[in-house]
Each structure stands twice: as structure tokens, then as C-alpha cells.
Regions:
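Short loop/turn segments immediately following beta-strands, especially the blade-tip
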Residues: 171-179
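Hydrophobic alpha-helical segments and helix pairs
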Residues: 84-139
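Short, solvent-exposed loop/turn segments at conserved positions within beta-propeller repeat blades
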Residues: 35-36, 118-124, 163-166, 212-213
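Beta-rich, blade/repeat-based domains predominating
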Residues: 12-27, 56-74, 95-110, 140-157, ...
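Residue position within the beta-strands of beta-propeller blades
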Residues: 31-33, 72-73, 111-115, 160-161, ...
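A short beta-strand motif characteristic of beta-propeller blades
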Residues: 6-12, 48-54, 87-93, 135-141, ...
């Protein structure tokens, strides 16, 4: 494991509710969303170019597509923007009082898209898996604030955060990624330190977690030990 920190400000910007930074390695750009501002932002650090795109609805996450464009987790479901900016629904499932939140792309190409109620009703959200062929499966249906999702480098474990639980949970992955079992806590964030929100997994298999209301980023080992 490396020991350098390399922490700095990549870009100064503003948002009503900024969320979901994603590195698009193909295009060499950073993508993130302003959920309540209904905008997708991009930034190319090599050129300094920035773009802002308005979305159809409040947007919880935006991920790059292999065919170009973006897949977006919106208020009423999951949609697609093609390379020319044309919009279409991939999974349209309106639910009054609820919106899409964080989402992540699995090693098999499926999109795991979370949702939550605007008033954070306990158990009012879900975690949905959208297969590459568009088939939708509800994996969890008792979620409050569905947030970070990520996979171990070997694809055998999935990590997941439902923010109010204060936990980073881990599942075992089966059937090429289409099924998860054995949910259990990997780590728990102590009272007063903030709440776990977004996450990503590094090449060492360690889990990096951003803490909402904690002004911090932590790294946990695959065994659940806090090492940064």
C-alpha cells in the first residue's frame, strides 16, 4: 500500500447538493452532479475545459457509457443521454416523494442505482440492479438513504452504504455479479465523526469512504480496519 496522501483542491465550484464524482478514464474527465440543481458537471484537468448540462429532473448520479453519453439516476428512474445529448428512459418508475441518489457501475456492466425519499423516510428507498440488457431487479427494498456502492478488485465482494446506519456493509457476489448474499458490517463510523456517504475501492482492495457532516475521507482495509 502506498503512503502518500496527495490531497488538494482539484477545482473550485459550487452546487446546491454536489455528489458522485466519477473519473471517466476514456475521456480523461471528471463527472459529478448537482442533485437539486439538476445539472451534470464535467471537468477536463488537462485542458481546463468545463461543461454543465441540465437534466430532465433532479439527478443523483451520472456515469459514462461505453457507447458515448451518460447513464443518469433521476427522480423517476434511470435514463440515458446519447453522445449527441438526446434523452431516453432506460427504466421509468415514478414514485411520488422519492428520487434517485448514488449509483455505481459493477464489473459486469450492470448499474446499481439507489433511491431515497425526499424527507428521508426510514426504509423508503431501494437499491436497484439494471443489467446491461435493461432488466431491472430490486435488490434491497428497505433502504433509507442509499449511497456508496463498490466492488473488490476480484469482483467477489460488494460494499454498500445506507447512510443513517453509519455502517459500511459487505456482501458476497455470486452468478457473475447478478446476485449478492451474506450482508454484514465491514466497519461502523462512530458517533460524532459524521455519516458514511460515497465510497470507492482502490487497487489494493481498500475501501475509501467520504463522511457527510464529518469533513473527512477514510480508508478501510478489506478486513475493516481503519488505516487512514
Amino acid at each position: 500500500m502506498g503512503t502518500g496522501t496527495g490531497v488538494g483542491t482539484a477545482l473550485r465550484t459550487s452546487a446546491e447538493l454536489g455528489e458522485g464524482p466519477t473519473w471517466d478514464a476514456t475521456a480523461g474527465r471528471l463527472i459529478w452532479v448537482d442533485i437539486l440543481g439538476a445539472r451534470v458537471h464535467t471537468f477536463d484537468p488537462a485542458s481546463g475545459n468545463r461543461t454543465v448540462m441540465s437534466t430532465e429532473q433532479h439527478v443523483g448520479a451520472a456515469k459514462p457509457r461505453a457507447a458515448g453519453g451518460l447513464v443518469v439516476n433521476l427522480r423517476d428512474g434511470v435514463g440515458l443521454y446519447d453522445a449527441e445529448g438526446r434523452f431516453s428512459w432506460l427504466h421509468h418508475a415514478p414514485s411520488p416523494g422519492r428520487r434517485g441518489n448514488d449509483a455505481a457501475v459493477a464489473p459486469d456492466g450492470a448499474l446499481w442505482a439507489g433511491s431515497m425519499c425526499y424527507d428521508e423516510t426510514p426504509g423508503g428507498g431501494t437499491l436497484l440492479r439494471l443489467a446491461p440488457d435493461g432488466t431491472a431487479t430490486t435488490v434491497l427494498d428497505d433502504v433509507t438513504v442509499s449511497n456508496g456502492t463498490g466492488w473488490s478488485p476480484d469482483g467477489k465482494r460488494m460494499y454498500y452504504i445506507d447512510t443513517p446506519t453509519r455502517r459500511i456493509d459487505v456482501f458476497d457476489v455470486h452468478e457473475g455479479g447478478s446476485r449478492v448474499t451474506g450482508r454484514r458490517p465491514l466497519a461502523e463510523v462512530e458517533e460524532g465523526a459524521g455519516y458514511p456517504d460515497g465510497l470507492t475501492v482502490d487497487a489494493d482492495g481498500c475501501v475509501w469512504v467520504a463522511l457527510w457532516d464529518g469533513a473527512a475521507v477514510r480508508r478501510y482495509t478489506p478486513e475493516g480496519a481503519l488505516d487512514r
